[in-house]
Amino acid sequence: MLNLNELKSGFHYFVMGWHFITQKGLRRFVIIPILLNTILLCGLFWLFISQISSAIDWVMNFIPDWLSFLSVILLTLSILTILLLFYFTFTTFSGFIAAPFNGLLAEKVEKMLTEENINDDSLVDIMRDVPRMLAREWQKLRYSLPKIIALFLLSFIPLVGQTIVPVLTFLFTCWMMAIQYCDYPFDNHKVSFDIMKTALGNQRTQSLTFGGLVTCCTFVPVINLLIMPVAVCGATLMWVENYRNDLGFNMNRSFSSQTGLDVRSENTGIVK
């Protein structure tokens, strides 16, 4: 069910992301994600332009003759599906490459909001976190890949593949964008992936609104070059205002006496 308050808050966090990237003290942490985003988007655009014609012809071959009168609508939906599949490719590569930089940006935004340190600022501490961040990106890929394959297989079904699948693909993309960018502040506190999904799912309208705005802006020229750090900043604000206290954290990473839970465990989510 649509929650209007969550709809507004999802929009609010996205807008605030734009505010944060202009803040003094954060700009130098924003530059690297923007440069990486620019390189990856240029590569994706070249790949899309070179392959779009063949991809459209391939998809349209699955439309039966008796639906030819809907060809324009179905063609549009097919192109949207292809765009979203290319987008998945982009986010997968960008997630792995930019993870350490996005994690650092999320850490600095949270420090600005709370005036409390999460980790040491030493290079050794940052490098120590890189393997964990990359493992987390692999975990997100393992979560999304079976669903992407399922949507891909559904696209072979006449009519369903050109009508329902684009809608499902868009909704799933919105959900994955919320997971992708909210994961950076969650992971900085070593919150398990499953607990993060549950937390975001408890405010699903907010998550889908935020992820939907990120997804849509990715297809807008110039804006898409900035969207990665914007999304990280907005997602970090969302974490601080919605989840940080509810998950029972203090900045010494001890678990809350109120819940008795430590959400840092990757295996069970509970420390006995």
From Swiss-Prot:
Q: How does this chain sit within the bilayer?
A: Multi-pass membrane protein
Q: Which GO terms describe its molecular function?
A: high-affinity sulfate:proton symporter activity
Q: Which Pfam families match?
A: EI24
Q: Where are the transmembrane segments?
A: 29-49, 66-86, 148-168, 219-239
* Gene Ontology CC entries for this record: plasma membrane
Database matches in InterPro entries: CysZ_sulfate_transptr, Sulfate_CysZ
Name the GO terms of the biological process aspect: cysteine biosynthetic process; sulfate assimilation
Q: Where in the cell? A: Cell inner membrane
Report keywords, A-Z. Answer: Amino-acid biosynthesis, Cell inner membrane, Cell membrane, Cysteine biosynthesis, Membrane, Sulfate transport, Transmembrane, Transmembrane helix, Transport
Q: What does this protein do?
A: High affinity, high specificity proton-dependent sulfate transporter, which mediates sulfate uptake. Provides the sulfur source for the cysteine synthesis pathway.
Recorded hits in HAMAP family, A to Z, give: CysZ
Q: Which family does it belong to?
A: Belongs to the CysZ family.
NCBIfam families given for it? PRK04949.1
Q: What is this protein called?
A: Sulfate transporter CysZ
Question: Origin organism of this chain?
Answer: Haemophilus influenzae (strain 86-028NP)
State the encoding gene: cysZ
